[in-house]
Amino acid sequence: MTDITTPFPATPHKLGLYPVVDSVEWIARLLDAGVTTLQLRIKDLPDEQVEDDIAAAIALGKRYDARLFINDYWQLAIKHGAYGVHLGQEDLDTTDLAAIHRAGLRLGVSTHDDSELARAIAVKPSYIALGHIFPTQTKDMPSAPQGLVELKRHIAGLSDYPTVAIGGISIDRVAAVLDCGVGSVAVVSAITQAPDWRAATAQLLQLIEGKE
């Protein structure tokens, strides 16, 4: 893991609603619906198969002046000038963090326990994601859910960092998550599997950011 001596560029302390989606189509829909922080997460495909989609998503993010993070594909994120990159713990050892830093991109890092939190803090990221908070079907997780007590404990020690809670957060759980002091709530199925994604997005924006 590359030693980083200066912090990655800052993001707002409260990133608000943070949908994580797997297609440019979802990026376009959510930007049009007023979302300003979001992540494109396409998994396990060669760079040449995803570059067009990543470039298109980044262009959309710039058009809407949004904070678009690219999951994993850091070289393409640098090439096309993304707002930021999001990495899992398993990516920290294999990614050229210094290259991301030199390019001026923001960095978000996933964490699941105290040891991973320490690793994340060591690279001085722009934000730290804490999860998974509740059981989730969206992604296979080797760790147990953190729950609200652990979330609150972790956030209490991260006052210098923007924080993002992720994992199994449905609309009816948002208020309890926010009460833990987190600055952002990441969602997947709460939007993508909602019977009416527009209504769900509007409700989440109102709950998390106070947007009508």
UniProtKB/Swiss-Prot annotation:
Record pathway: Cofactor biosynthesis; thiamine diphosphate biosynthesis; thiamine phosphate from 4-amino-2-methyl-5-diphosphomethylpyrimidine and 4-methyl-5-(2-phosphoethyl)-thiazole: step 1/1
Superkingdom, taxonomy of origin:
Bacteria
Q: What is its EC number?
A: 2.5.1.3
Q: Where does 4-amino-2-methyl-5-(diphosphooxymethyl)pyrimidine bind?
A: 39-43, 71, 110, 139
Recorded catalytic reaction(s): these are: 2-[(2R,5Z)-2-carboxy-4-methylthiazol-5(2H)-ylidene]ethyl phosphate + 4-amino-2-methyl-5-(diphosphooxymethyl)pyrimidine + 2 H(+) = thiamine phosphate + CO2 + diphosphate; 2-(2-carboxy-4-methylthiazol-5-yl)ethyl phosphate + 4-amino-2-methyl-5-(diphosphooxymethyl)pyrimidine + 2 H(+) = thiamine phosphate + CO2 + diphosphate; 4-methyl-5-(2-phosphooxyethyl)-thiazole + 4-amino-2-methyl-5-(diphosphooxymethyl)pyrimidine + H(+) = thiamine phosphate + diphosphate
Picking any one GO biological process from the record gives: thiamine diphosphate biosynthetic process
Q: Where does 2-[(2R,5Z)-2-carboxy-4-methylthiazol-5(2H)-ylidene]ethyl phosphate bind?
A: 136-138, 168, 188-189
Biological role stated in the UniProt entry:
Condenses 4-methyl-5-(beta-hydroxyethyl)thiazole monophosphate (THZ-P) and 2-methyl-4-amino-5-hydroxymethyl pyrimidine pyrophosphate (HMP-PP) to form thiamine monophosphate (TMP).
The text of the family note is:
Belongs to the thiamine-phosphate synthase family.
Q: Which protein are we looking at?
A: Thiamine-phosphate synthase
Instruction: State the taxonomy lineage.
Output: Bacteria, Pseudomonadati, Pseudomonadota, Gammaproteobacteria, Enterobacterales
| The encoding gene | thiE
